[in-house]
Amino acid sequence: MIIFTANINAYDNIPDHYYDGDVKYVMFYDKPIEQKGPWEFIELDCKYDDPILNAYHTRCMSHLLFDEPHVWIDGCYTMTEQFVKNSKEFVERNEITQMNHPAKRTLLGEVLKTYRLGFVPEERLYRWCKKVAASGFKPSYFDHTINCCIWRHNTSRVKEWNEYYWNYHFVDGEFCHHIGQATSGIAEYLVFGRDRIPRVPLQVDLSLSSRVKTYGDSYNISENINEDEFRSKARKILRAVL
């Protein structure tokens, strides 16, 4: 089993993890970082000028990196002995596993969060909603996950899921930052349908983060100020409940 992460734009400090001798650890980076622990540090062949896109691409398109069972973890969260033990069980049991979000939102609620925090300009989000509606995705299907950890094998279904997970970040060639919890749900619908992806409880402590940069250090934040109007229009496009 491989556990991998990406420390792009020196966004995180490496936490004090528990390391298992039977696990291979791989960290991708683009700028000089402190290298500690038994990681294999690999300088990323960056495909994009935006460091966030490089980090997202690494997380989403894991089938391009590994043939073995592999676990993504955001670089700011700490792995415990129990985390590694559970990870071995998850990859033994399922071809892909996701975590239930501890504070679930609807699809529209997730889009509104993205709007409210300014990660995506309003006009682009409207176009993204239209793309989702055109896919046939039903908002009632959406079961909110948190993707700071994902357990995967390199199978044909996982490859297809990865590609939808990545591609639904884009609309008309423009990237929609911080909407991956929605795009993973769309990917699940398009690939797995009624089969669903197995869910597990949260496996990391979100309150313990080694992140050293703010969103403003890496994202171009938009000033979205018409939330009531946006909610009404996006709801009609998606045919979604609040």
Describe the residue ranges of each PLM region.
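N-terminal anchoring/stem segment of glycosyltransferases
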Residues: 1-55, 65, 69, 169-177, ...
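Residues that flank catalytic or metal-binding motifs in active/ligand-binding sites
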Residues: 21, 59, 73, 144-147, ...
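Short acidic (Asp/Glu) patches
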Residues: 50-60, 85, 128-135
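Short, solvent-exposed loop/turn segments at secondary-structure junctions
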Residues: 8-11, 32-33, 47-49, 77-79, ...
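Conserved donor-nucleotide/metal-binding helix-loop-beta segment in metal-dependent transferases, i.e.
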Residues: 79-112
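Catalytic core and acceptor-binding pocket of nucleotide-sugar-dependent glycosyltransferases
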Residues: 116-228
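Short beta-strand-to-loop acidic/aromatic patch adjacent to the donor-nucleotide binding site
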Residues: 68-77
